Amino acid sequence: MDGTVFLGGRVFDFAVRFIKNLRESGRRVLFFTNNASHNPEYYYDKLRRMGFDPQDGEILTSGDVTVEFLKSHRPGKPVYLVGTPELERQFTESGITLSDSADIVVTSFDTTLTYKKLDTACRLVRNGAEYLSTHPDFNCPTEDGFIPDSGAIAAFVTASAGVTPTYFGKPYRTAVTMMCEITGFPTDDICIFGDRLYTDIALGKKNGVTAILVLTGETTENDVSAAAEADRPDFVINSLADADRAIFG
């Protein structure tokens, strides 16, 4: 969402119009963000205030995907979580026990990050804990520039503990599976708009989903030119305004 339909606290008016036109044409809309620092309720409220009028079941985060994996594949196992209080609350409300001595470590985008949190995560992973991460994004775009994201935090743990995490969210198959389950459509009938080559666009390229890059967020035209052919989007547009004009005139 961030960098595609809004940037920080600034809404893209053309995005509001585009989403409205999609719904009125009978198309299914799903807002998917890798930013797990906030829970889905936060995004519902934010999008409502911005004028998007999100409906039930239209918002999915990498935190949702991670929680679903833990509940389905690691039931009852405690987790050490490096995340915001909102993400901690989402985990506990989903029935996941948080512990400082767990056999599973999950790192995420944590704006309350401390050295103690990093040290604990590294020690646990170094001693054999399973290492998971909600999403691989290195930077989060804001109105004031980029700030370190989940991937940067995971890189710290990997450098210290020597273990690469299993990632969820975009661009991984677990995310696509949840998208298909929620929308009821197969990958052939889904199109993703996003601003990042290595998450949004990679989701499409790796999983048979049409991928359209918008230049309102992290990626520049130079980045696209420098990317390998297999990693380039199916289409590049300046913003969702271009998509709105192309589809609806």
Protein language model annotation of sequence segments:
Residues 28:
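Conserved phosphate-binding loops in N-terminal lobes of ATP-dependent enzymes
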Residues 1, 6-17, 21-24, 40-60, ...:
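Asp-based, Mg2+/Mn2+-dependent phosphohydrolase catalytic module
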Residues 35:
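Conserved phosphate/oxyanion-binding catalytic-loop motifs
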